[in-house]
């Protein structure tokens, strides 16, 4: 309605403090097992062009013990929806889509390739060993220095034969394991719009509350070091008035006693309870987010979200709409 009409600048000024930049650092962990008697793990950064990038065997379950070269990082946009630091975003921001069957096929190719490589190296190393041993056995002109070099070659060859044999046998064993699982291991952090960030260590830790891939919906929560969830003491969920856009924090009706807030009290809280209906007229739409993540967001005045406009081009159903707004990776949310 005209009463609730805002310019692009007014919308940005009122709501941008409730927008957050989301950083998801993640890797995938594969577990192979044979009904509980034996299991082994591999980690990789992503599936690309049919290959598991940066794949490595691991014995660690600690996120921070995994080499950073194995991890991928993606960015997205989130919106604060409660004073306790609950944030809504897209599922694919916190849970990048992948295909378990394609991962399994890529793993099998990787294991077979590793086995073939070991067999090739074993053949070459055994040939070298045979040359060293024959030189010692048949070369009567071999002096002490030459003899020492041949012995060093023999010892090195035998060591590499043992190493390649063990590695190959382990890959053959892994290839025979019948149970296969893939797990996403991630560390999710956020930065408030307008904040000055110099490194990822300054970002705020979050954890996943709900992930609904079918609707591309994700809910994350700002983590408190002493208490991950009950950071607000509420008799019941806060009730939001229909005047959210104008009243901001003052629209919380006293539904209970809030001991303290997770987020700074100058942050805008988005209203998810607006059931306003529209007719079929063309509706102007605004998108606020972080196109290309920190690449465009980092400014001399801190992290800044961008706001763009377009129109709803099609109401597909009650859940999905199509819109004509320019957007880049990082604006998801």
Question: For the regions a protein language model found, what residue spans apply to each?
Answer:
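Catalytic-histidine neighborhood of serine endopeptidases
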Residues: 82-215, 224-225, 234-240
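Short, flexible loop/turn elements at secondary-structure junctions
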Residues: 26, 224-226, 327
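Short, solvent-exposed loop/turn elements at domain surfaces
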Residues: 28-34, 96, 229, 294-296
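Flexible, gly/ser-rich surface segments that form the specificity/activation loops bordering the active-site cleft
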Residues: 47-51, 62-63, 67-68, 73, ...
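Sec/Tat-exported extracytoplasmic proteins
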Residues: 23-26, 89-91, 95-98, 289, ...
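Short, glycine/charged-enriched secondary-structure capping and boundary segments
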Residues: 35-37, 102, 300-303
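Terminal peptide-recognition signature
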Residues: 20-22, 78, 85, 89, ...
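N-terminal activation segment of mature serine protease catalytic domains
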Residues: 1-90, 183-194, 200-201, 205-209, ...
